[in-house]
């Protein structure tokens, strides 16, 4: 089955998506599409690396709900994927039709002690700059410790 990808990226976003570095950052202003391009990278990863789970990290769970969930629903649809949001588990499951592609585990960086006990191949770290530096550093170190499949 051939899937038509409808999502588009601007030039800076396209450059970001083509980076091969282990750790990459899309640093831009308000409304520039940082979360959008991160979600594009997430969906692209599920197409090329099925069943390698990923993580999404935001300062708080309400930010995950308000920023990530609507964006990933839209981007996944545009990229030929369907998402099933498991609110109670803080997970997003990705499918191509009925074929399972992977799961994104969502965690709050505000409580970095919850960033333990799982393996992921990629991480989307959103809004890290709004956290106090010490909390951001602690969360970052916990997140990169979860990256076991890279």
Residue ranges: model-predicted function:
Residues 1-150:
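Phosphate/NTP-binding elements of NTP-utilizing enzymes
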């Amino acid at each position: 089955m051939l899937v038509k990808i409808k999502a588009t990226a601007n030039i800076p976003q396209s450059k970001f998506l083509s980076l091969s570095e282990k750790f990459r950052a899309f640093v831009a202003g308000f409304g520039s599409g940082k979360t959008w391009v991160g979600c594009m990278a997430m969906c692209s990863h599920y197409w090329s690396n099925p069943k390698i789970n990923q993580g999404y990290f935001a300062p708080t769970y309400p930010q995950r709900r308000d920023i990530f969930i609507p964006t990933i629903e839209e981007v996944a649809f545009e990229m030929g994927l369907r998402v099933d949001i498991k609110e109670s588990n803080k997970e997003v499951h990705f499918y191509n039709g009925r074929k399972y592609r992977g799961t994104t585990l969502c965690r709050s960086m505000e409580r970095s002690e919850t960033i333990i006990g799982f393996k992921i191949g990629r991480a989307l770290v959103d809004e890290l700059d709004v956290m106090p530096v010490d909390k951001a550093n602690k969360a970052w170190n916990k997140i990169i410790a979860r990256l076991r499949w890279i």
